[in-house]
Amino acid sequence: MHWMEVTEESSVLTSFYNAEDESNLLLPKLPALPKNYSTTAKIFSEEKSDEIMKLLGDVRLNALVLGGSSGFIEIYAYGMFKIATVTGVAGSCRGLCLSSDLKSLSVITEIQDSSGSEAEITYFQLDTSLLSSYLPEVTRMARKFTHISTLLQYIKLSLTCMCEAWEEILMQMDSRLTKFVQEKNTTTSVQDEFMQLLLWGKASLELQALLMNQLTVKGLKKLGQSIESSYSSIQKLVISHLQSGSEALLYHLSELKGMALWKQKYESLGLDASGIEEAITAVGSFILKANELLQVIDSSMKNFKAFFRWLYVAMLRMSEDHVLPELNKVMTQKDITFVADFLTEHFNEAPELYNRKGKYFNVERVGQYLKDEDEDLVSPPNTEGNQWFNFLKNSTHLKESPLLFPYYPEKSLHFVKRQMERVIDQCLQKPADVIGKSVHQAVSMSLYKTSQSEDSTPQLFKLPFLWNDKTSNIHYVLFTILENSISKIYILRRHTDTSRSVSNGILAVEFGNFLNNSINESSDSRCYSCLDAHFYDDETVTVVLKESVEQEGKERVLAQLPLSSVYTDEDQDKELIWDSTKRLDEQSGEISTRTVFLENQWRVLENMKAQYVSVNGIRKVSCVLSSNLRHVRVFEMDVEDDGEVEEEEEEETTQIAAGEPDELNQSADNQDNVCGASAEELPDETEEHESSLDP
């Protein structure tokens, strides 16, 4: 995994970065999702909305690069939407580095012919010049993709909130009304009994007992208020969230279509106007279905309110309680119609639902739109007699008109949403395929074979290490090759522009003596192997070293290696003539070697068998990990030395207490040797942590 940010500057890019996004002027701000629903919706809550807007306002392109097995590599713009899929790179990916000018991608892979054989580490440089050549266009397209991806997530979470609002009343409906229907023992239908109560004002003794003992007046009132509140919440979510999100999605897709029609700029990137038009049509169908749901909610609310008001008054009269004057009034014909419609819709026999919701209680009209199922609506809207539908059926020209969005009267809102997501994904997948196919292999170098002893070490900590010098536009690769029991550090560098070359493309670095003579042996006989190396910044490499002869009292060293001591102005060394039929370790004798003396830029790592290092030059921090992966030390680098402060937290485990040789002992006399370094160059261990890293 690798994250990069474009740093290239040009007049075209500067004008693009400074240009204001018109969507901020033309589109209303998306309302925040309610916090009382799903926790996943909190990303669009009031507290998080500013962070989302900040992300969408970041015009400078940054990308997340992911690599997997079988040479599968993906590039995600802003870490959200895929803009390139690269295939065909041999081996399993172990390292990635996309140059900040987008001209090339460095890849380290591990190729293993069979399960028992040694793996071969190979370096590839992939040409990604299409991204670099069309950087303004890629950036604008990626911004649109990010907007569209964010809006799809916003719509999905809005629908999730609607479903949760509906589930609140669905549980109450099931536990009360369905139970009431199932326990009915009379031969007449529930619908007939309620109709008798509606028309004659009298209920059967059984219906009266069930209403008064199970449902109760108080329970009915509470149920009615809960249902009305949930209806209002769903209605508000449709109007303020689904519709606003869909309209914004339609706007950005329309802009994307306009970009696709500018073939000179965007055709090479794979934007397809016809595919985007299909996506626009799918969004239109979703908007139509959302509007249909609004009409159903409005109709159902009227029926529900009328039914519960009527039943509430009827139950008050059954219990001989006082009926308020505003409730004790003659029902109008419209009220009777609403109640009759409710009874017809919800207490009508539906044999296909016997095993799902109760034998005589039909699925609620609003809830069927929110079900994430492929089945058709149980109660689709009645379009008979609708003049517009009749006009469309009789018009041969309008039936296939691209100006009209398709309408799916038999499908739920969830179904239409999934169809919209599928069409949009297909539409936006093509650029990733086209850009991925444009990426081709420019360089392939077999470096070395891994030793069997390294198999148990997590690959996360293993060299090689990749780095991109954003100023000089150079790719670096750090790795070690064991030669005569000493691990030299090799520095491979290549220009990000695959058509250009750099001097000293491959060099080996060995470390001469730099420790004080007071450490046991003579300085002339001491050699150091490189255990791990990471770039601290563009000019410095942080390394972990050990003496080649492992003995008790031989300490590991954390040091800073300036590249200026490796690449000097008077370099006239002969360049390696690469033999592509051999691995690099088979040609190591022909590689120029630099012997480096680090002077004051080092520190002895006392009482720790250090093996791995990770650094951050921006934060000026280095982190050292022990060889058994159990102990960590954190160092502050390049700080003023106001007096060394050390905080040690000794981990007391049974293994260490038993004398496990994970940590080396250092005499107190040797501690003074650390203090001879420069105050600005010496790593200052201001904080040290030793903790167990076992899972």
Model-assigned labels for residue ranges:
Residues 61, 68-72, 486, 629:
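Surface-exposed loop/turn positions within WD40 beta-propeller blades
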Residues 113-695:
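C-terminal scaffolding/assembly regions of large eukaryotic complex subunits
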Residues 1-56, 92-97, 525-533, 604-613:
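Canonical WD40 repeat/beta-propeller blade segments in eukaryotic WD-repeat proteins
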